[in-house]
């Protein structure tokens, strides 16, 4: 059995745009494929609920040798401050926290591998769960700085 505690990571970058403008970008999940190294596309389940807490969206992820889709629920949506979603409702929580900075906005991307995700991996992968969890953790650690750099480039290009 693996450690079922929450695994977390976060990194920040300063972006030369306002918190509201940056929020408008990162909360548009249909643009995720422009900056994510893994998620190639996202779409809202119900356009009328898009961007609101409780709204659901699907994402398509690709890594060498594997493609899969996820369903996520928006769990935080406060313009200029935070946008976050939970994959599968309780498996992994991703978020973007925004704070005014002297020169623009500090954008912090957060990642939490939740106990529900650990349990699912243990059920699905058995003895291989620790390796699979380590692999997904490494993908997040590698992807976050790449994602932040891409968001900065896109936001500052206007």
Predicted regions and their residues:
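Hydrophobic ligand-binding cavity/cleft-lining segments
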Residues: 1-52
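Residue-level detector of alpha-helix boundaries and kinks
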Residues: 7, 17, 59, 129, ...
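A generic helix-loop boundary/linker signal
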Residues: 12, 47, 64, 130-134, ...
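Solvent-exposed residues in well-ordered beta-strands and their adjoining turns
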Residues: 14-18, 60-64, 99, 110-114
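Short amphipathic alpha-helical segments with heptad-repeat character
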Residues: 16-19, 23, 134, 138-141, ...
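Glycine-rich portal/gate segments that line the openings of hydrophobic small-molecule binding cavities
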Residues: 43-93, 101-106, 142-150, 154-158
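Beta-strand/loop substructures that line and gate deep hydrophobic ligand-binding cavities in soluble
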Residues: 86-142, 151
């Amino acid at each position: 059995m693996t450690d079922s505690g929450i695994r977390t990571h976060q990194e920040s970058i300063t972006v030369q745009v306002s918190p509201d403008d940056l929020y408008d970008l990162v909360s548009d999940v249909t643009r995720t494929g422009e900056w994510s190294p893994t998620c190639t596309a996202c779409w809202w389940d119900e356009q009328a609920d898009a961007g609101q807490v409780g709204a659901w969206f699907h994402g398509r992820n690709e890594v060498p040798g594997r493609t899969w889709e996820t369903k996520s629920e928006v769990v935080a949506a406060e313009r200029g401050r935070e946008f976050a979603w939970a994959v599968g409702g309780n498996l992994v929580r991703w978020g973007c926290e925004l704070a005014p900075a002297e020169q623009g906005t500090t954008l912090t991307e957060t990642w939490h591998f939740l106990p529900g995700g650990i349990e699912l991996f243990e059920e699905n992968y058995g003895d291989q769960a620790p390796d699979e969890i380590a692999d997904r953790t490494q993908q997040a650690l590698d992807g976050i700085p790449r994602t932040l750099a891409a968001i900065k480039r896109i936001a500052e290009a206007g």
